[in-house]
């Protein structure tokens, strides 16, 4: 396994050497949630709610539904975290919604870790003075994502582009069109 990883690392380093602009995806690439499935974060939020005597029956279902609902009513290609919690607010009230939102961000931060292999690749690109960007289809804010990157040792990159903040996504390819213009890529 280690030999395969070293071989893959060398292959990626060769590609980095041939390019000036290096991009990384964020979730499930540079950063990992230290849970089996991403939605398990909502189970952990639920546990924290119980500890605070704010038990919300079926929170995970409500949270998944709220995200789906926010996506279905959005006029943009991607949504923001606040869009999800505006839907939740209608179910649980404004005060509780704000508390739950803070808990979810805290749980995200606690269970997000650097992917050691990608961190090694990032460090190599940085050592070669490459222009490094991060791109993600994600509802969490750029500010929050940047704090997670910093906490996990990703420093010295050029920029972070988040679909929720920009209202365009990688999935539609509009993010790439935007980046091509923004970064003057031929």
What are these language model-derived features?
Residues 133-135, 139-186:
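Substrate-recognition "cap/lid" segment bordering the active-site pocket of phosphatases
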Residues 9-62:
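Active-site neighborhood of HAD-like aspartate-dependent phosphohydrolases
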Residues 41-103:
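A metal-dependent, Asp-based hydrolase signature
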Residues 75-86, 90-134, 146:
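Short, acidic loop-to-helix structural element flanking the phosphoryl-transfer center
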Residues 38, 77-81, 110-114, 118, ...:
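Phosphate/oxyanion-binding active-site loops and adjacent basic polyanion-contact surfaces
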């Amino acid at each position: 396994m280690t030999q395969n990883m070293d071989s893959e690392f060398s292959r990626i380093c060769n590609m980095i050497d041939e390019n000036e602009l290096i991009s990384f995806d964020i979730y499930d690439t540079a950063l990992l949630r230290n849970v089996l499935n991403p939605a398990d974060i909502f189970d952990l939020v639920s546990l924290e709610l119980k500890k605070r005597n704010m038990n919300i029956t079926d929170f995970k279902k409500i949270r998944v539904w709220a995200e789906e609902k926010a996506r279905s009513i959005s006029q943009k290609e991607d949504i923001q975290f606040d869009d999800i919690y505006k839907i939740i607010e209608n179910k649980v009230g404004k005060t509780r919604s704000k508390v739950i939102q803070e808990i979810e961000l805290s749980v995200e931060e606690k269970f997000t870790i650097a992917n050691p292999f990608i961190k090694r690749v990032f460090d190599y690109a940085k050592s070669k003075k490459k222009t490094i960007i991060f791109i993600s289809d994600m509802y969490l804010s750029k500010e929050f994502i940047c704090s997670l990157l910093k906490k996990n040792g990703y420093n010295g990159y050029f920029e972070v582009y988040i679909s929720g903040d920009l209202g365009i996504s990688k999935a539609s390819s509009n993010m790439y069109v935007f980046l091509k213009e923004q970064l003057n890529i031929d």
